[in-house]
Amino acid sequence: MNSFVMYGTAILSIAIIGYMLVKKMDIKITLFFIGVILMYIAIVAGNTIAIKDFKSSGAGLLDPLLAIVSTFKSTLAGAGFIILLLGGYAAYMSEIGANEITVSVLSKPIKNIRSPYVLVPVVFLLGNLLSLVIPSASNLAIILLATLYPVLRKAGMSPLTAGAVIATTATIMPTPLGSDNVAIANELAKYPEFAGLTVSQYVFGYHAIVSIPTLLIMAIAHYFWQKFEGRNEAIISANEVEKTEGSYCSNSVLYRSAYVLLPILPIILLVIAYFIKLLGYSKVDLTVEIAVVISFIIAVLCDSIKRHSLKEAVKETEKFFKGMGNAMPIVALLVAATVYVVGLKSIGLISALQNVMTGMNGNGLGFVLPLILVVLSAVIVLLSGSGTALFFAMVPLIPTLASAAGISAIAVAVPMGLAGNLLRAVSPVSAVIIIVSGSIKADPIEVVKRTSIPMIAGVVFMFILSMILFL
């Protein structure tokens, strides 16, 4: 294929997708459409569709559509199914009130802390812990605004300080239940150097050793930045804010003790299984799918005991399957991104990039690729407010580009994935910033001013640590 046509087509497609991301438009259909167009261009130019072991339908006109079907099948058999299960389990936890109880129980200890600025790092770390239960940044912010915000105000914390801390709670807590972690782990496992890699191994072996120190650094940065910014703020009583109590929070101690563990039970099972295997006591691999299914069965049993009715408990399980359906857009985005990448591979762009990047590591420039992708993530996130859209779109490309640059795919995957989640709280158009600023009656830019330094400090520290560990 002519180089001018190849690069021109690729640049135009990237520009269209970038425009749609910035405009916060749904890019799934665009990725599908552009991917198919690129495959047709490749076929006209005499290239083949770049899918391993792809068998043509016998009609070139149908092959790009067959590629979509093939990609859907392979994704649903792997990462897609895990994401659907996680969506179902999260929805079921909300339905039976377990999420509400977990938030209530974990929030209680902070009521005894009276210093507003000591509360800043405590609430930040607590909020990130709660993101294991409620991974959506906007949903977690809504819950914390209703439950923790009044407590923080009564402790003397200003609205902007409290809002900034709440806006930054769902960031980079390492969890095998994160759909972004599931997607990249399954993609890496397709390559020989990461053969057999599970989500737990990726999260605890790579993600956590960067994300946990980064969270601690951000907690410290939060303390000093909020204290610096709040030096001229008046302490105002929060009598106007009413605390809302969850409808499930007045039940027995036994009930609360059991339900508080249910939302994080899959994580507990995966952590236990991971360390048992690490210590050599077992060779059993507990997958995310099995952990979720076991947890779901236990949750149904607990709910039937609480309701004194198996019939009523089983009726509520319908929410699990509806939750799976609600998670389908994430799977569709992953498939759409893969189809687009197949299109880029088919026109020869990926091979051309590999040739350009070969030798980069030998010249001591191995950090350039991760840096470019982190900067690109920053631009897209700041303009669009989406922390993971670009990452999902890039997942199929990460191993290939890293190999071409002569560096580990982990050195690309970890910083790019973490950067998007961190910088979400710095975008004035992100859902979480809009929700928080509206709730505390402040301008989004004022909230972003309070979140920016801790998040940027986290990105810089995270990138440097990733390069030291993985490059």
PLM regions and their residue ranges:
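Short helix-coil transition sites and intra-membrane helix breaks within transmembrane domains
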Residues: 26, 76-80, 90-101, 131-143, ...
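Hydrophobic alpha-helical transmembrane segments of multi-pass integral membrane proteins
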Residues: 82-85, 112-147, 335-337, 360-400, ...
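Membrane-interfacial loop-to-helix junctions in multi-pass transporters
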Residues: 3-7, 73-80, 108-122, 155-161, ...
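Long, contiguous bundles of hydrophobic transmembrane helices that form the permeation core
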Residues: 3-14, 18, 31-38, 42, ...
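Alpha-helical transmembrane segments of multi-pass membrane proteins
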Residues: 116-130, 155-175, 197-206, 366-380, ...
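N-terminal alpha-helical transmembrane segments of multi-pass membrane transport
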Residues: 1-87, 91-110, 114-117, 219-244, ...
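Re-entrant/interfacial helical elements at transmembrane boundaries that shape
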Residues: 102-104, 138-151, 179-190, 388-401, ...
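Core transmembrane alpha-helical segments of multi-pass membrane transporters/permeases
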Residues: 53-100, 285-351
